[in-house]
């Protein structure tokens, strides 16, 4: 910070002794030392804050880069999946359409004016494959047993010594005498 050698420090000390006197010099030196320490702590705090902000900015940029890369991967996967699904549906419809045309029914299969149903999809019925959704209200309404035990009001309070005595085997108990 400052380039103060031993000779410069001694010169400053002598000037301070002459100007302030021997009575006030120790008090001023303590105050100056405390102020210097505070200044150093403040500078170190500012440096640490700046370095944290720089790290946060770097992490934010990394996060945005990662999110954009994930979005790009997701869109490419979805595009490829849609493309392959379209090809599969086209192949399926051409195969099913060829079988229906060979069966002898004239006209287009599944047209709005005809009574013939549309060609089935290769996936089958969507209702049969739909996952059964459970009723989450049942799960939400059930209170866990551990919570019931932890929060219930105790009707029979027992001290630690009484609890130990209650669960101690009879062979280890001391005989009780009243007189």
UniProtKB/Swiss-Prot annotation:
Keyword Transferase: no
Gene Ontology MF term list: protein transmembrane transporter activity
Topology within the bilayer: Single-pass membrane protein
InterPro entries, alphabetized: TatA/B/E, TatB
Biological processes per GO annotation: protein transport by the Tat complex
Cysteines paired by S-S bonds: none
One GO cellular component term: TAT protein transport complex
Listed Low complexity bias regions: 101-115
Chain segments annotated as transmembrane: 1-21
Family of this protein: Belongs to the TatB family.
Function as written in the Swiss-Prot or TrEMBL entry: Part of the twin-arginine translocation (Tat) system that transports large folded proteins containing a characteristic twin-arginine motif in their signal peptide across membranes. Together with TatC, TatB is part of a receptor directly interacting with Tat signal peptides. TatB may form an oligomeric binding site that transiently accommodates folded Tat precursor proteins before their translocation.
Protein name listed in UniProt: Sec-independent protein translocase protein TatB
Source organism: Burkholderia cenocepacia (strain HI2424)
